[in-house]
């Protein structure tokens, strides 16, 4: 528990801002994801949820945060994490699905008063209490999965500190049939929703026109749509945009997204197939080649605008 007496001159804890690899998402969130908060990324398969988190972790490492990765899918690989820019000699990797065991393993890290940590739970959907595995019937009590998630989240949120911790959660999508029409939601719905400061939905476009393939027909670039479903950072609920994930490289095409936003904001002027910025002009969006100075100027205008 944190008590701040303003009469005594005590100040609120300061947060740090960890940028995401998406220019548009940073713009909507006020620079990136804030420390001392919980952030949920959910959406369609292969929409780059884990890739996005690895890039955020890489940025956090440059700011002195140590990664703690709870890998309930047993999918973590050093090679891919390194492709995303992470220092793979630094993280603590916890692989498992039983909530009690995971909490026991990471509690010393949560209670650490000196080191800053960034936690990644990938994914929420696989975590269960020991009751599920211990009982012969699988602990099929009504709402066990939802209670398990709520128990786990409340334990973690208790250790949040604005200066020291930031938590990323990945969840799969589910179809909610409780209303008149089916809707897509993050798995475990309200239980997860109430404990999150930011909820970001990622949706992979399956349009062939928005995919790029190499000569062997392997997909080299795909467009991913994002939307902010909940945020405690700034008034940007409902804001949406897109970025491009590069599945073969383990990357996100920041430059291409920046150009798209600059064209939408008319920072780069488009006339037919020609694009103009200052005295420079290019024929076709794929031929736009920004210098370092131009890249910096456009980035500043996009983030401020």
Show the residue positions of the predicted features.
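Catalytic P-loop NTPase motifs of RecA-like helicase/translocase cores
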Residues: 76, 127-128, 177
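Long, well-ordered amphipathic alpha-helical subdomains in the mid-to-C-terminal portions
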Residues: 253-283
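A short alpha->loop->secondary-structure connector
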Residues: 62-64, 84-91, 135-144, 185-189
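Terminal-proximal interaction/regulatory segments of ATP-powered molecular machines
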Residues: 273-305
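Phosphate-binding/switch loop-helix module in NTP-utilizing enzymes
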Residues: 96-165
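Short, ordered loop/turn segments at secondary-structure junctions
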Residues: 72-74, 96-97, 124, 173-174, ...
């Amino acid at each position: 528990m944190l008590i701040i007496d303003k009469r005594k001159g005590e100040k609120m804890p300061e947060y740090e801002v960890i940028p995401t690899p998406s220019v548009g998402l940073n713009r909507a969130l006020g620079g990136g994801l804030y420390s001392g908060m919980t952030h949920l990324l959910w959406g369609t398969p292969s929409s780059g949820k884990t890739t996005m988190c690895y890039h955020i972790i890489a940025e956090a490492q440059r700011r002195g945060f140590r990664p703690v990765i709870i890998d309930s899918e047993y999918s973590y690989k050093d090679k891919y994490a390194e492709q995303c820019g992470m220092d793979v000699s630094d993280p603590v990797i916890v692989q498992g699905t039983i909530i009690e065991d995971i909490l026991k393993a990471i509690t010393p890290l949560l209670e650490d008063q000196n080191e800053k940590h960034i936690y990644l739970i990938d994914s929420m959907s696989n975590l269960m209490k020991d009751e599920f595995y211990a009982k012969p019937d699988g602990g099929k009590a009504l709402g066990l999965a939802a209670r398990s998630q709520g128990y786990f989240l409340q334990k973690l949120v208790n250790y949040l500190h604005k200066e020291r911790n930031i938590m990323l959660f990945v969840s799969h999508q589910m179809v909610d049939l409780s209303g008149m029409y089916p809707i897509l939601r993050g798995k475990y719905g309200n239980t997860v929703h109430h404990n999150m400061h930011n909820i970001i939905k990622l949706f992979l476009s399956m349009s062939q026109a928005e995919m790029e393939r190499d000569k062997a027909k392997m997909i080299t670039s795909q467009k991913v749509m994002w939307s902010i479903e909940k945020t405690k950072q700034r008034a940007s609920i409902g804001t949406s945009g897109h970025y491009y994930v590069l599945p073969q490289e383990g990357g996100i095409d920041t430059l291409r997204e920046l150009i798209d936003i600059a064209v939408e904001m008319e920072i780069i002027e488009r006339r037919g197939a020609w694009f103009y910025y200052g005295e420079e002009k290019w024929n076709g969006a794929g031929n736009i080649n920004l210098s370092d100075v131009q890249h910096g100027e456009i980035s500043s205008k996009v983030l401020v605008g």
